[in-house]
């Protein structure tokens, strides 16, 4: 077989990860290796309840019902189109779809699996919202590994975020006084929110990333 971004496939591949005719369902097989798919897609009957309650569907041309229906076909061409599209990045992962599906599907999990595969195969770079994952990795992912937080007040620099206005600039310049009223250990070691995370805890966090494959995914 051929080895492509962590997957052994039975059959030849063209450049760019596209699968030749006659090897139907290989993208589907890749998706089914994601544990989220087993709970996310059981048996969609196209009722449309997920789309009706989806907040993202109110703002985008987005139909989670159609995404699940497409994946169910196991059609490589259709699934690849999803992997390269903007569509899979519209979901806010609120999981409103999860408790409402009469067949027990969770379209949000299917979208998560599609996003994961799109990133592993490099297809995410072909959509604007997909490419925004680079910014999220730098702005949030690296913050987690460095500080233990997704974001802290000191990371929202007014020079980089002028939309925050003059009030935020004042808060930023006086952050210890402002946030110190809520927690005396603000950005210091000790208990409480917004404390400085000690190095031992940060090392444990990094080890979790390494053991779960997160670090390899970050560096790929």
Question: What are the residue ranges of the model-derived segments?
Answer:
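C-terminal, charged low-complexity interaction regions
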Residues: 167-220
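Short, Φ-rich (hydrophobic/aromatic) sequence segments
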Residues: 5, 138-141, 209
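Ferredoxin-type iron-sulfur electron-transfer modules in oxidoreductases and energy-metabolism complexes
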Residues: 21-35, 59-90, 94, 104-170
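Local cysteine-cluster metal-coordination motifs and their immediate loop/turn environment
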Residues: 40-59, 88-105
